[in-house]
């Protein structure tokens, strides 16, 4: 009985978000965004960058900077569009995070969702298993910290906008996730 | 060993029945008379951008009542007003927004957004909405009405980019409705709590019905196999 209680307590502790690579670590430019997200968030939108992939911490940190540079300097946005970026090195990179509204989907969805992108193009291949694990861990820690509703729903980018994102293969994977709802 | 296998099958039937019968949790909205209910119902853009959507009321033990529907062409953003009901349809953003203004206690009940495509079963969007409207106490607040526009007896059907030629879906209203804009109230909905109730009676009924029919099939198969091999 005592053992069961201890085990349950450990499970509760296990879902912290400390595995996320913070902005300072991947040397992000400062954010100029100010619109906040209300918590808990009900929707998660999964996309892909359709750009280069990366499979090491060095190359993924560089890729995250590249994406941010494109969004800030080319597109003129206040920051990288996504709330989180997933690298095929198996790490989660902090974008706008849990508290700031992203620019990942559209004017209706951005204020009511967390946008998670996989760095790469996943039309013809699935992301590395560690990348998928990282995303699921991120979602689990989001729920345990109260950023996501416990009955949150995952949508593919193409479910809510006219786009190919997150790519045929990644889309097929997320459709098998427990919280996916078309 | 065959007996164990057969009991295993029975278990599978039971489990699959319960899974199939799990309905969407209700989302509860607690509001006060005079307030506005706003519900956002997303739909799948690939499957339903061009489908008709509706807001329905679900009276206890009766057929769903369709209150307001989106108007053709469904491919363009549109706004439909039907008395206190407003449907804002944005097919490019995959969102249907429902508003019910000037809520009364009698508006309390169960509602839902659906993809409306008879004779097919409607597809429920978002969650069933459990609306609970209570009388506001006089010292809490009164809605600031700026301004009130008195409408005529006839129902209003406003669609952007499209002049309505089909008026058969409108209902005539018995009294004038007022469009109340209450900007001072700010947030118009309170998000439902996480601990929402599942309508257990409907789950139980569908589980039992399914179980009975599956048990019947199981029994028949059992008898047939016994006869063949027994």
From Swiss-Prot, chain A:
Residues covered by the N-acetylmuramoyl-L-alanine amidase domain: 39-167
Domain of life: Eukaryota
Location relative to the cell: Cytoplasm; Secreted
GO biological process, alphabetically ordered: antimicrobial humoral immune response mediated by antimicrobial peptide; apoptotic process; biological process involved in interaction with host; defense response to Gram-positive bacterium; detection of bacterium; innate immune response; killing of cells of another organism; negative regulation of inflammatory response
InterPro entries, per the entry: Amidase/PGRP_sf, Amidase_domain, Peptidoglycan_recognition, PGRP, PGRP_domain_met/bac
Gene3D superfamilies: Peptidoglycan recognition protein-like
Presence of keyword Signal: yes
Entry's family note: Belongs to the N-acetylmuramoyl-L-alanine amidase 2 family.
Subunit structure, as described in the record: Homodimer; disulfide-linked. Interacts with HSPA1A; this interaction forms a cytotoxic complex that is released by lymphokine-activated killer cells. Interacts with HSPBP1; this interaction blocks the cytotoxic activity of the PGLYRP1-HSPA1A complex.
Function recorded in the entry: Innate immunity protein that plays several important functions in antimicrobial and antitumor defense systems. Acts as a pattern receptor that binds to murein peptidoglycans (PGN) of Gram-positive bacteria and thus provides bactericidal activity. Forms an equimolar complex with heat shock protein HSPA1A and induces programmed cell death through apoptosis and necroptosis in tumor cell lines by activating the TNFR1 receptor on the target cell membrane. In addition, acts in complex with the Ca(2+)-binding protein S100A4 as a chemoattractant able to induce lymphocyte movement.
Protein name: Peptidoglycan recognition protein 1
Organism: Mus musculus (Mouse)
From Swiss-Prot, chain B:
Keywords tagged on the record: Adaptive immunity, Cell membrane, Disulfide bond, Glycoprotein, Immunity, Immunoglobulin domain, Innate immunity, Membrane, Receptor, Signal, Transmembrane, Transmembrane helix
Glycosylation sites noted in the Swiss-Prot or TrEMBL record: 191
Chain ranges passing through the membrane: 203-223
Domain Ig-like V-type span(s) in chain numbering: 21-124
UniProt keyword annotation of Nucleotide-binding present: no
GO biological process: adaptive immune response; innate immune response; neutrophil chemotaxis; neutrophil extravasation; neutrophil migration; neutrophil-mediated killing of gram-negative bacterium
InterPro entries: Ig-like_dom, Ig-like_dom_sf, Ig-like_fold, Ig_sub, Ig_V-set
Ranges of the Extracellular topological domain: 21-202
Phenotype upon loss of function: Deletion mutants do not show any influence of the antiviral T-cell response. However, TREM1 deficiency impairs secretion of CCL2 and TNF-alpha by neutrophils in response to viruses. TREM-1/3-deficient animals have decreased neutrophils in the airway and these neutrophils have a defect in transepithelial migration.
Residue intervals annotated with topology Cytoplasmic: 224-230
Subcellular location per the Swiss-Prot or TrEMBL entry: Cell membrane
Function description: Cell surface receptor that plays important roles in innate and adaptive immunity by amplifying inflammatory responses. Upon activation by various ligands such as PGLYRP1, HMGB1 or HSP70, multimerizes and forms a complex with transmembrane adapter TYROBP/DAP12. In turn, initiates a SYK-mediated cascade of tyrosine phosphorylation, activating multiple downstream mediators such as BTK, MAPK1, MAPK3 or phospholipase C-gamma.
Name listed for the protein in its UniProt record: Triggering receptor expressed on myeloid cells 1
Naturally occurring in which organism (per UniProt): Mus musculus (Mouse)
Taxonomic lineage from the root: Eukaryota, Metazoa, Chordata, Craniata, Vertebrata
Gene this protein is translated from: Trem1
């Amino acid at each position: 009985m005592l053992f069961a209680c201890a085990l349950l307590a450990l499970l509760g502790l296990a879902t912290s978000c400390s595995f996320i690579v913070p902005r300072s670590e991947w040397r992000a430019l400062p954010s100029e965004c100010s619109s906040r997200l209300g918590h808990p968030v009900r929707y998660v939108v999964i996309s892909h960058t359709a750009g280069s992939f990366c499979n090491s911490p060095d190359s993924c940190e560089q890729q995250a900077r590249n994406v941010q540079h494109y969004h800030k300097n080319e597109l003129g946005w206040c920051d990288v569009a996504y709330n989180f970026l997933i690298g095929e090195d198996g790490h989660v990179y902090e974008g706008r995070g849990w508290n700031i509204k992203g620019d990942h989907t559209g004017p209706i969805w951005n204020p009511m969702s967390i946008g998670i992108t996989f760095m790469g193009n996943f039309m013809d291949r699935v992301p590395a298993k560690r990348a998928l694990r990282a995303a699921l861990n991120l979602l689990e820690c989001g729920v345990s910290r109260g950023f996501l509703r416990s009955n949150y729903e995952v949508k593919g980018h193409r479910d809510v906008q006219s786009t190919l994102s997150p790519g045929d293969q990644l889309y097929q994977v997320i459709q098998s996730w427990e919280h996916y709802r078309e | 060993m065959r007996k164990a296998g057969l009991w295993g099958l029975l278990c599978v039937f039971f489990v699959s029945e319960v899974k199939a019968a799990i309905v969407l949790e209700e989302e509860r909205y607690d509001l006060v008379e005079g307030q506005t209910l706003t519900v956002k119902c997303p739909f799948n853009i690939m499957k339903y951008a061009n489908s008709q959507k509706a807001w329905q009321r679900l009276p206890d033990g009766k057929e769903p009542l369709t209150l307001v529907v989106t108007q053709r062409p469904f491919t363009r953003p549109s706004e439909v007003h039907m008395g206190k009901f407003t449907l804002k349809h944005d097919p490019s953003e995959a969102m249907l927004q429902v508003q019910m203004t000037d809520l009364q206690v009698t508006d309390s009940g169960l509602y839902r957004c659906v993809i409306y495509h008879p004779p097919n079963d409607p597809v429920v969007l978002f969650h069933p909405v459990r609306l609970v409207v209570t009388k506001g106490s006089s010292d809490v607040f009164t809605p600031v009405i700026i301004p009130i526009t008195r409408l005529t007896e006839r129902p209003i059907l406003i669609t952007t980019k499209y002049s309505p030629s089909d008026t058969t879906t409108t209902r005539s209203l018995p009294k004038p409705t007022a469009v109340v804009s209450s900007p001072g109230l700010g947030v118009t909905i309170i998000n439902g709590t996480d601990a929402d109730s599942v309508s257990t009676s409907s789950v139980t009924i569908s589980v039992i019905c399914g179980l009975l029919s599956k048990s019947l099939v199981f029994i028949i198969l059992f008898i047939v196999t016994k006869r063949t091999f027994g």
